[in-house]
Swiss-Prot record:
Protein name in the entry: NADPH-dependent 7-cyano-7-deazaguanine reductase
UniProt family annotation: Belongs to the GTP cyclohydrolase I family. QueF type 1 subfamily.
Biological process according to GO: queuosine biosynthetic process; tRNA modification
Family matches, as HAMAP family: QueF_type1 (MF_00818)
InterPro entries: GTP-CH-I_C/QueF, NADPH_dep_7-cyano-7-deazaG_red, QueF, QueF_type1
Gene name of the record: queF
EC number: 1.7.1.13
Amino acid sequence: MPTQPSRDLQTFPNPKPGRPFEIAMECPEFTCVCPMTGQPDFATIRLRYVPAERCVELKSLKLYLWSFRNEGTFHEAVTNRICDDLVAALAPRWIEVVGDFAVRGGIHTVVTARHGERPAGV
């Protein structure tokens, strides 16, 4: 398993693919760089998803999120990129990615990206 930032999201088989259930994760140490100012942006990334056949492996998720720390990107772009990359890796029944960014210039930004239909009762 790598120990450096990587865009390679590893997955493993869902242990209960016949039962819809939600997985929730919070990553409070996300960083990227503002493409306008070059200053660091800090965020908490919250993931919630209902897996189909695959689940994301946590260390690979940590290294994936770490890979953005020196990248210039807008809050809206990176939140949607994370959602798109997780959809490509997992093909979940439903996923929600929330980027809750620290205040910059007196403005608190929260970006939410979703994919799929959330199963009833989950």
